[in-house]
Amino acid sequence: MSTDKTNQSWGGRFSEPVDAFVARFTASVTFDQRLYRHDIMGSIAHATMLAKVGVLTDAERDSIIDGLNTIRGEIEAGTFDWRVDLEDVHMNIEARLTDRIGVTGKKLHTGRSRNDQVATDIRLWLRDEIDLILGEITRLQKGLLEQAERESDTIMPGFTHLQTAQPVTFGHHLLAWFEMLSRDYERLVDCRKRANRMPLGSAALAGTTYPIDREYTAQLLGFDAVGGNSLDGVSDRDFAIEFCAAASIAMMHLSRFSEELVLWTSAQFQFIDLPDRFCTGSSIMPQKKNPDVPELVRGKSGRVFGALMGLLTLMKGQPLAYNKDNQEDKEPLFDAADTLRDSLRAFADMIPAIKPKHAIMREAALRGFSTATDLADYLVRRGLPFRDCHEIVGHAVKYGVDTGKDLAEMSLEELRQFSDQIEQDVFAVLTLEGSVNARNHVGGTAPAQVKAAVVRGLTLLASR
């Protein structure tokens, strides 16, 4: 006869119930219930394996699976009663299963601990989340390629130190973000590979005495392999840390892109227009059209960076194997995944709708002596050392600042006062088109190279 005074699955050795506040403080069901699909998936695979090795009968297996599928339906219908006193998603589902099918429900946990159960659930969940995020990256990249192709010959100023540097095409600029997102995609694919190793079968920490078939369970759940050490399987969360690191890099890229969009929509730049559906107004200033989506993405990057630091701090002092600290792994991981996915979705919707203001971009590229490097290169081709050419053009730029003339606005006579190597053909070099077309190599800003890069990008997306 049971003498459990706690009503908990682990209450046999306890003589009094858990304090009500402590029960609430230690419960995780309010946030880990989002793992229910993966918890049920893992339990169905575990029950199937237990029947295969003879620990459960086929009838017991079928009863458990039918019960779990019914519970999944209750959860998705919103009729499931989540109980804080049952601590977590695992015990809530197991208790409901026992309510429905009786003592057979108590056999499900044979050869399993919540330690390897939750580690498995999180990996299954993260695997699915990464797949969703990869889809949003691809969708955003497709939008960038479409915009880049349309704007392959749209000229704008390129910047260093936020100062006018050299002319570039808007398409080339957009493709820089495509390249960064490609690396983000690769990092997440690599992260998924390491997350897709099954800890189930590690039990509490040392494995189990039952004749389990871990490879069979892994096959049922779509894992690439089983973990090779039970202590490692239940205790580490490096796969979650790795995801948050990859997510942080991706959010850093989106944050930088957001900063550019905020600048470009400002009255001081006016390079692009964002459709109204991605903006909001002011409660006091009637004229305002605020780029809230990029501003929020820029701000939300801090949440993901915080999740990374939180998980690193969470893990750094833990001895092997499982510790209750690890309950704190889920909220930062969930938030990081949600934030990255939503930010990518917002960008994937917004980028194709950007409307560049071609005339303003071009006018900005005509200011700031953006073709100064082209003049230096022109003189190099005339046989002068580059450092001498750099100094010559620097004097010409100073003259331009003093007279209010860009290099292309100076007469041949004015230019020749700095070098007698300058001839009439220099003016073709000093045009914006001459500047961008001259950079006609792989990775360059020339329109022909932008179009070629778009083709390569589309091929990459098609291969995924």
UniProtKB/Swiss-Prot annotation:
Tell me which EC number(s) this protein carries: 4.3.2.1
List the transmembrane segments: none
Q: Mention any one GO cellular component term assigned to this protein in its UniProt record.
A: cytosol
Species name: Pseudomonas fluorescens (strain SBW25)
List keywords of the entry alphabetically. Answer: Amino-acid biosynthesis, Arginine biosynthesis, Cytoplasm, Lyase
List, alphabetically, the PANTHER family matched.
ARGININOSUCCINATE LYASE (PTHR43814:SF1)
**Gene Ontology biological-process entries:** arginine biosynthetic process via ornithine; L-arginine biosynthetic process
A Pfam family that this protein carries is ASL_C2
Pathway note: Amino-acid biosynthesis; L-arginine biosynthesis; L-arginine from L-ornithine and carbamoyl phosphate: step 3/3
Q: What is this protein called?
A: Argininosuccinate lyase
**HAMAP family reported for this sequence:** Arg_succ_lyase
Judged by the first EC level, this protein's enzyme class is: lyase
Q: Where in the cell is it found?
A: Cytoplasm
